[in-house]
């Protein structure tokens, strides 16, 4: 599994509802690997927005192929949101190497 993470700040005077309306994709791509996307606001700083996308059943080698399909949609989305948020301070894709339930004993 891969995880895409993005951190940015809502601009002064912009609330999350306004951002979300502009952020929603204007086109759905069948087979988009980002099947679960979580957006969260920092509880201590509600202008700090963190977005995580879970990308299941994907290999890092697949990134160029699906980015080629998604780029036109993402470019349009960027044009809609760029005046609402700062440039990302984090924008990366990570490969999951462990998954743990910290409410249970963990065995090596």
Segments (PLM) and residue ranges:
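Acidic/histidine-enriched, glycine/proline-rich intrinsically disordered or flexible terminal extensions
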Residues: 93-108
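Short, surface-exposed coil-to-beta transition loops
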Residues: 36, 47-50
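An amphipathic, aromatic/His-enriched active-site/gating alpha helix that lines ligand/cofactor pockets
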Residues: 24-38, 54-92, 107
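Short, surface-exposed ligand-recognition loops at beta-strand->loop->(often short) alpha-helix junctions
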Residues: 9-20
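Short, charged/polar surface micro-motifs in flexible loops or helix N-caps
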Residues: 12-13, 46-47, 56-61
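A short beta-turn/loop motif at secondary-structure boundaries
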Residues: 40-46
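Active-site-flanking beta-strand signature of metal-NTP-handling nucleotidyl enzymes
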Residues: 1-9, 50-52
């Amino acid at each position: 599994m891969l995880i895409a993470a993005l951190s940015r700040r809502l601009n002064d005077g912009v609330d999350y509802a306004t951002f979300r309306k502009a952020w929603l994709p204007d086109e759905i791509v069948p087979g988009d690997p980002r099947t679960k996307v979580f957006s969260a606001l920092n509880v201590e700083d509600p202008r700090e927005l963190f977005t995580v996308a879970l990308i299941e059943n994907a290999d890092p080698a697949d990134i160029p192929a699906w980015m080629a399909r998604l780029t036109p949609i993402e470019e349009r989305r960027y044009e809609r949101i760029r005046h609402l948020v700062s440039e990302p301070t984090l924008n990366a894709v990570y490969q999951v190497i462990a998954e743990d339930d910290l409410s249970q004993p963990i065995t090596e």
